[in-house]
């Protein structure tokens, strides 16, 4: 009887212990869910806000075309659009003629020759399309910091009438920095090298990418649309989860470009399966960001001391 009683007590104790443990696990799970709930809600809110901003940026990008550029960069003069002079950012060709040792009357014929040479570098369908347009005006236009020290121009073309504009941008292409360490590119024309590289790497390139030499033939240029519905993301406004997703998309795009232009098997073998390359890129990025800040600090000091001339508020 005592033995039977002991067995019953042990069984009850074990059942009670299991019930207690089950209750504790249930409470712990509920507590974890309560903690996870706000995080999930916050993540969902961030995702919704990111989607809203993306749709807004996409809609804004769709307005960035030649018609928008026309309203900002040109004015109607005697029934014909002319690029507005906004020195030092925009200087029309009529004010640049003397710079190139030309008379104002010589500018348009020279532009036509350049336009003809550029069209010859395009596929037949694009060339045929551009034959519907004629040059109306041109100007030198200062662009981003990445192009400081190089020449950049814009050309206004007109299709069926004055309200059918097309703006093309002409940017100087210099020698690749890799030529100091690697064999020279098989493209002797730097503009062609840039264009062929973009066509190779990008899933969808600008349909009007082409190239020419300058008037003095010593400078190389590539042509593209000034505005073709391009947009940009405001990284500084992104939440951490959105920034992570954006970085992954950029990484995927960059990897795809490398795979299109190189040997994907060799690159995959080089990268391997560990995170050594990831850590190297992270360390390099951090050092590069620090270097940028230091360079900018020296740049500002040079301006303030008068060693470097600069025009502010442009």
Question: What feature does the model see in each segment?
Answer:
Residues 1-68, 113-314:
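Conserved ATP-binding subdomain of kinase catalytic cores across diverse folds
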Residues 73-75, 80-126:
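Catalytic core of tubulin tyrosine ligase-like
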């Amino acid at each position: 009887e005592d033995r039977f009683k002991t067995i019953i007590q042990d069984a009850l104790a074990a059942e009670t212990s299991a019930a207690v443990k089950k209750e504790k696990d249930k409470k712990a799970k509920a507590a974890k869910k309560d903690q996870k709930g706000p995080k999930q809600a916050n993540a969902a809110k961030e995702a919704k806000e990111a989607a809203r901003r993306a749709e807004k940026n996409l809609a804004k990008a769709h307005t960035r075309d030649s018609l928008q550029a026309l309203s900002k960069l040109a004015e109607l003069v005697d029934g014909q659009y002319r690029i507005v002079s906004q020195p030092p950012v925009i200087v029309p060709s009529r004010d640049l003629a003397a710079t190139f040792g030309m008379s104002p009357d010589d500018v348009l014929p020279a532009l036509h020759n350049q336009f003809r040479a550029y069209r010859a570098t395009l596929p037949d369908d694009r060339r045929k399309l551009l034959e519907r347009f004629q040059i109306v005006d041109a100007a030198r236009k200062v662009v981003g910091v990445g192009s400081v020290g190089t020449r950049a121009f814009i050309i206004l073309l007109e299709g069926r009438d004055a309200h059918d504009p097309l703006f093309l941008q002409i940017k100087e292409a210099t020698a690749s920095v890799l030529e100091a360490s690697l064999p020279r590119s098989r493209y002797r024309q730097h503009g062609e090298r840039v264009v062929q590289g973009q066509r190779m790497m990008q899933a969808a390139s600008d349909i009007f990418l082409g190239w020419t030499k300058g008037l003095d033939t010593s400078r190389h240029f590539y042509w593209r649309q000034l505005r073709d519905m391009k947009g940009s993301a405001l990284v500084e406004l992104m939440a951490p989860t959105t920034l992570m997703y954006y970085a992954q998309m950029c990484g995927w795009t960059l990897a795809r470009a490398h795979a299109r232009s190189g040997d994907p098997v060799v690159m995959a073998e080089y990268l391997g399966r560990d995170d050594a390359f990831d850590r190297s890129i992270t360390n390099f990025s951090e050092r590069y960001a620090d270097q940028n800040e230091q360079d900018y600090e020296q740049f500002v000091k040079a301006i303030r001391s008068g060693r470097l001339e600069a025009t502010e508020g442009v």
